[in-house]
A protein has these predicted regions:
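N-terminal periplasmic accessory domains that precede
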Residues: 77, 92-93, 120, 134, ...
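Short acidic/polar hinge/loop motifs at secondary-structure boundaries
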Residues: 82, 107-111, 116-117, 122-148
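Transmembrane beta-barrel wall of Gram-negative outer-membrane proteins
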Residues: 176-178, 184-216, 220-221, 225-267, ...
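Outer-membrane beta-barrel domain signature, strongest for Gram-negative TonB-dependent receptors
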Residues: 231, 235-370, 492, 505-507
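Structural signature of Gram-negative outer-membrane beta-barrels, strongest in the C-terminal barrel
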Residues: 246-252, 259-261, 366, 386-513, ...
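Membrane-embedded beta-barrel scaffold of Gram-negative outer-membrane proteins
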Residues: 300-304, 310-328, 451, 457-461, ...
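Gram-negative outer-membrane beta-barrel transporters
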Residues: 407, 415, 512-514, 529-614, ...
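C-terminal beta-signal and adjacent terminal beta-strands/loops
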Residues: 605-612, 632-684
Length: 684
């Protein structure tokens, strides 16, 4: 692979376009255009800021991109972002850091490993177990914020690579509602959704009730084995979700919101690998019927104490179930796996200096408690339990040193504890192991921001990220082993510009990451700590109007990574991190024929990247361009949309595993094939 950054034709065109598109006005809000950065409010760093004021590298998917049904899952919504790679059955990889980390597959059970990217919905962290499921369905979502780089100071656990923060819509005082029906050409794929909201007691009590049901099939072609016939629907995927909110506002200073949400997904979800001899026949390497259920009850309290102080409280309880039934050529080779989790989240934050011209900030207390029980029955037999908890005090203060200059300092001190029991019938014996981990960590953050004009802001920041150590089973050595925590020090400089009254928006971040103890999967498939590795790169995103009826939007990411030192994994020294394409780029163009009728065309390019840390050529993937096309008719009452995903029907790999004794045909993961769909939404 190339040793220097390279620009393909897509990026050259995009850069040239960004340089020449000056002037003109943004389309009106009712034309469903992208918002200006200074009007987008993000909340994923424990405080409300405009996107222009945020010093992290943040990309936002707002409701204008979510409402037409073209994006079916969180993974699809993130796939066009700079320096983000979405792999099958995985949380997103950011800046060359595997989002799953050591938590992929069996390691998630044997050692309770944690993912490196946290996903939060309305402030509540979502569990990740072995294989990504449960991210389908984006109905009634306000926006998705994607933070690249460590967010450990804000979120603590499993945020060393970044965080995805999703906000759902709040109850309204005005009565409103909507229903939607959507269809895709994936064999009877039907998406139905509805929402209703309004006041029960005027200005005092409001509600919101939303629901979505997706019934369809995936693009896999699973065979039914003659040696083990079944009547199970191997390719079905059914998803249902319901969310109810009740907002109580007895005064202008107090708001209490009760939320209950339930989610279930069953069928052909998770990782999709296909036999490599005929990969685009989509015959799966293995077959599993996944089952995910989640029930969450949460209370949010926002109380304004006086002009200087306010209090935010979040209390949430979650019941979470994850599992699968395997389907194999022989019934004796099948296993049924299940995991039950209950967890409690408490986060209390005091905001201060709300009316102070010199300083403002917050201090908070956070508590998380998780209990798990898991088992596998059948060809593979194991069981165990897990008790994990964390307690943290965190805070952040900003000092306005002058009208233009602001200094921000933050710190999180967190105590993490984990006790995990793992028992497995292994080669004639019973393996009994225990992981007993506890650690106190300090996660600082320092940033400085300078407003060089009303239009442009510059900033520089430094922060620290952390992910806990764990344990895992080495099948080859017949040994249960332990590995240490990993940390990263991240340094960034960047700028945000909103030019010509919001006509042009440009965001840029330059970053450097220094990793210590990076948790890596060795060539023996053993999680190993790499003493020293680094990465650096750039993210640029921009939006601009071209006249009154055209809008250009694009972005690109440049990335270089290197493993500098590893005594336990010497073959990897000097290599790239896996899932680290040197270039990711996107370019889109929107045109309004009328105030209501809009067409959008976008393309996303992902450079080639290695699939392992030994950088074997047989595992290189990437080097593909995915194109999307949509046409939307949007009025006060109707939203009618037709779209094509992967419009040019690109065939490419996101993962490759060569032929071996274990996999005589090899296997691959592929980009989703061309999909044509439409949706109709009626608002009232």
């Amino acid at each position: 692979m190339a040793t220097a950054f390279k620009l393909n034709s897509l990026t050259k065109v995009m850069l040239a376009s960004l340089l020449v598109t000056q002037g003109s006005a943004w389309a009106d809000d009712d034309q469903n255009s992208r918002k200006s950065m200074d009007t987008i409010v993000v909340t994923g760093e424990k405080t409300e800021k405009s996107l222009k004021e945020t010093m992290s590298s943040v990309a936002v998917v707002d409701k204008s991109l979510l409402e037409n049904g073209q994006l079916a899952s969180i993974s699809e919504a993130l796939s066009e972002m700079a320096n983000v790679v979405v792999l099958t059955g995985s949380v997103p990889d950011m800046r060359g850091v595997s989002g799953n980390g050591g938590a992929t597959g069996f390691n998630s059970f044997s050692g309770g490993s944690k993912a490196r990217v946290s996903t939060l919905i309305d402030g509540v962290s979502q569990p990740f177990v072995a294989d990504l499921t449960g991210d389908t369905g984006l109905w009634d979502v306000e926006q998705i914020e994607v933070y690249r780089g460590p967010q450990s100071t804000s979120n603590g656990r499993n945020s060393i690579a970044g965080a995805v923060y999703m906000t759902t819509k709040a109850p309204t005082q005005e009565f409103e509602g909507a229903v939607r029906v959507g269809y895709r050409n994936q064999d009877s794929y039907l998406d139905t959704a509805a929402v209703v909201s309004g006041a029960l007691v005027e200005d005092v009590l409001a509600f919101r009730l939303s629901t979505q049901y997706v019934d369809g099939e995936t693009f896999s072609n699973p065979p039914v084995y003659e040696t083990n016939p079944t009547d199970r629907e191997l390719n079905k995927l059914n998803t249902s979700s319901t969310r109810a909110k009740l907002l109580y506002t007895p005064s202008k200073d107090l708001a209490v919101q009760l939320t209950y949400s339930t989610y279930s997904e069953e069928g052909n979800s998770g990782r999709k690998y296909f036999l490599a001899d005929e990969p685009f026949d989509y015959e799966p390497l293995y077959q599993r019927i996944m089952d995910t259920e989640s029930d969450t009850t949460q209370v949010n309290v926002d109380y304004k104490i006086n002009d200087d102080f306010s209090l935010d409280v979040l209390v949430a309880y979650m019941d979470y179930k994850w599992g699968f039934e395997a389907y194999e050529p022989l019934e004796s080779a099948e296993s049924d796996v299940s995991m039950d989790e209950s967890n409690i989240t408490v986060d209390t934050k005091l905001n201060f200096g709300l009316s102070n011209d010199f300083y403002s900030g917050f201090i908070g207390l956070a508590y998380f408690d998780r209990d798990q029980d898991f088992e596998s029955v059948g060809a593979t037999n194991y069981y165990g339990d897990d008790s994990s908890k964390s307690t943290a005090v965190y805070g952040e203060t900003s000092f306005n040193l002058s009208r233009e200059l602001t200094l921000t300092a933050g710190l999180r001190i967190e105590r993490e504890e984990q006790l995990r029991n793992f028992n497995m019938a292994f080669r004639g014996d019973m393996l009994v192991e225990q992981l007993d981990n506890s650690h106190t960590l300090r996660l600082p953050k320092l940033a400085i921001q300078y407003d060089i004009s009303d239009e442009t802001t510059l900033f520089a920041s430094a922060r620290r990220g952390y992910n806990a150590g764990g344990g895992a089973l080495d099948f080859t050595a017949e040994d249960y082993y332990y590995y240490d925590e990993e940390t990263v020090n991240t340094y960034e400089i960047g700028s945000r510009s909103v030019i010509n009254n919001g006509d042009i928006n440009i965001s840029a971040n330059v970053f450097y990451n220094n990793f210590n103890g990076y948790q890596a999967l060795s060539s023996e498939r053993k999680i190993t700590n790499i003493e020293d590795a680094h990465s650096y790169g750039l993210e640029v995103e921009a939006y601009s109007m071209l006249g009154d009826q055209w809008q250009l939007h694009g972005g690109f990411g440049l990335l270089k990574t290197k493993i500098d030192e590893s005594s336990a994994f010497p073959d990897a020294v000097g290599n790239d991190l896996n899932s680290a394409p040197e270039l990711t780029a996107s370019l889109g163009l929107s045109h309004w024929f009328t105030d209501s009728l809009k067409v959008n065309l976008s393309a996303n390019y992902v450079d080639e990247f290695y699939g392992d840390l030994t950088n074997t050529e047989e595992r290189v993937a990437g080097d593909y361009t995915i194109t999307r096309l949509s046409m939307t008719y949007d009025t006060e009452q109707w939203l009618i949309s037709a779209f094509i995903n992967n419009a040019l029907d690109e065939e490419a790999y996101t993962s490759q595993e060569p032929v071996s004794g274990r996999y005589p045909q090899g296997y691959v993961a592929v980009v989703n094939p061309q999909t044509i769909g439409a949706s109709v939404t009626y608002r009232f």
